[in-house]
């Protein structure tokens, strides 16, 4: 058996039997058939002079096919004095023990370590709670039994190592506990976030309500409540005469062309100042020729509707002059043919006849009043676009004639004739209605 194997076997055996290795010996080379009495007799001749001893146990070594014995010596025995080999049965028996030089080298290294750490042997004893009287009394003097002192020191070092190991383990456990707490907090925060997502609050309900709103609904409401802005703007910027009329009549308001309010405002305006109505009709006839916009047609229709309504809302008994002229259309045509011009009161008479007897007028399909002819079929024909007279050289003169005093009777107007053949007639169904209301 090699020396290294024998030393390893000694260390393991001492650790297993809890024996101090500094007082233990390993004797190898004992034959297999050698008994206990013979082994003790051989060892007694070698170890008895050195001090007391005892055989602890025996073991069989398979590699060498021999036995080995573990021997423990007394406290006063110096291991360096024990021989390493001695004769026995079957050959030479060898002795293996811890080398004292190894212990000296260990002590040297330990002292250097304590000096580097700034520690002393007293600190080691205090930390390990070892109360040794020899160390406290004789600090600088080496102990009498250095082997015993070395054993105590080794025990203290082992205890220090165990304490350091326990401290390191406690720190690791604390770190592991902190990591576990952190993971638990993270899991709790994640669960709380999921709970908040599952149970939204008032802000989430408001957000869902806002998402439910669609832009189409807003567009629909805007389309319903938004007025017809282009038509109002065009009506406001139509002509200067209309602006002047709106300024004079403060009660009249601009209304979209789709919904005319009626004939009250127009009739009152015509009753107050008939010249303003004539100027308005003249101003409207001028843009009809120059512009082709659909807005002008809407304005004309809005002006025609009150005229038709006035014809039906007039008094049942028209003036006598109007009846006479309506009954004799032939005389009117003759006077027109002689003079070559039409008179304004004849148009009023026709309007009154159509308002009074709408059914008989269907038979009279056409009434000629000089160069201008009017078709009277039904009350619906009042909605049709009337024939607007063209401008002629005598239109301005007729306009000057129209500025006559308001007190002229229709009978006096029939005798006078206009100079221009294509001049606009002075009277209109609207004015006739207004005059009838005055009467």
Curated annotation (Swiss-Prot):
Region entry Disordered, spans? 208-439
Please report any disulfide bonds recorded for this protein chain, giving both cysteine positions.
none
Signal peptide range in chain numbering: none
- Stretches of Basic residues bias are at 231-249
Bias-annotated ranges (Basic and acidic residues): 314-326, 395-404, 423-439
Lineage top rank: taxon: Eukaryota
Write down a Pfam family by its short name. PNM8A
Q: Which family does it belong to?
A: Belongs to the PNMA family.
Name this protein carries in UniProt: Paraneoplastic antigen-like protein 8A
What is the scientific name of the source organism?
Homo sapiens (Human)
Gene label: PNMA8A
């Amino acid at each position: 058996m090699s020396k290294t194997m024998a030393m390893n076997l000694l260390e393991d055996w001492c650790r297993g039997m809890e024996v101090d290795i500094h007082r233990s010996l390993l004797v190898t080379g004992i034959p297999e058939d050698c008994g206990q009495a013979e082994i003790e007799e051989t060892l007694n001749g070698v170890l008895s002079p050195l001090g007391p001893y005892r055989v602890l146990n025996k073991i069989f070594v398979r590699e060498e096919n021999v036995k080995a014995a573990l021997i423990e010596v007394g406290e006063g025995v110096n291991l360096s004095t024990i021989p390493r080999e001695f004769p026995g049965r079957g050959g030479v028996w060898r002795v293996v023990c811890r080398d004292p030089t190894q212990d000296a080298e260990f002590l040297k290294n330990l002292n250097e370590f304590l000096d580097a750490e700034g520690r002393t042997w007293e600190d080691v004893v205090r930390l390990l709670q070892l109360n040794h009287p020899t160390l406290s009394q004789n600090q600088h003097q080496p102990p009498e039994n250095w082997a015993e002192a070395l054993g105590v020191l080794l025990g203290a070092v082992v205890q220090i190592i165990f304490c350091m190991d326990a401290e390191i383990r406690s720190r690791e456990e604390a770190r592991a506990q902190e990591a576990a707490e952190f993971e638990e907090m993270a899991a709790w925060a994640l669960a709380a976030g999921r709970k908040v997502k599952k149970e939204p609050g008032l802000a989430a309900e408001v957000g869902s309500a806002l998402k439910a709103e669609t832009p189409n609904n807003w567009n629909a409401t805007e389309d319903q409540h938004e007025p017809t802005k282009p038509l109002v703007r065009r009506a406001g910027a139509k002509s200067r005469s209309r602006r002047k009329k709106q300024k004079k009549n403060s009660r009249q308001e601009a209304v979209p062309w789709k919904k005319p309010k009626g004939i009250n405002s127009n009739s009152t305006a015509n009753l107050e100042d008939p010249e303003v109505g004539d100027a308005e009709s003249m101003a409207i006839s001028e843009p009809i020729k120059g512009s082709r916009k659909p807005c002008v047609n809407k304005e004309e229709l809005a002006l025609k509707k009150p005229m038709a309504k006035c014809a039906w809302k007039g008094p049942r008994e028209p003036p006598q002059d109007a009846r006479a002229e309506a009954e004799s259309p032939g005389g009117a045509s003759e006077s027109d043919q002689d003079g070559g011009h039409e008179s304004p009161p004849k148009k009023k008479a026709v309007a009154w006849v159509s308002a009074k007897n709408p059914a008989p007028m269907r038979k009279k399909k056409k009434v000629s009043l000089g160069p201008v002819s009017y078709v009277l079929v039904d009350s619906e024909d009042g909605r049709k676009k009337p024939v607007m007279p063209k401008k002629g050289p005598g239109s301005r003169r007729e306009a000057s004639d129209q500025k006559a005093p308001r007190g002229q009777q229709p009978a006096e107007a029939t005798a006078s004739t206009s100079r221009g053949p294509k001049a606009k007639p002075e009277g209109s169904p609207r004015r006739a209605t207004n005059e009838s209301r005055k009467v």
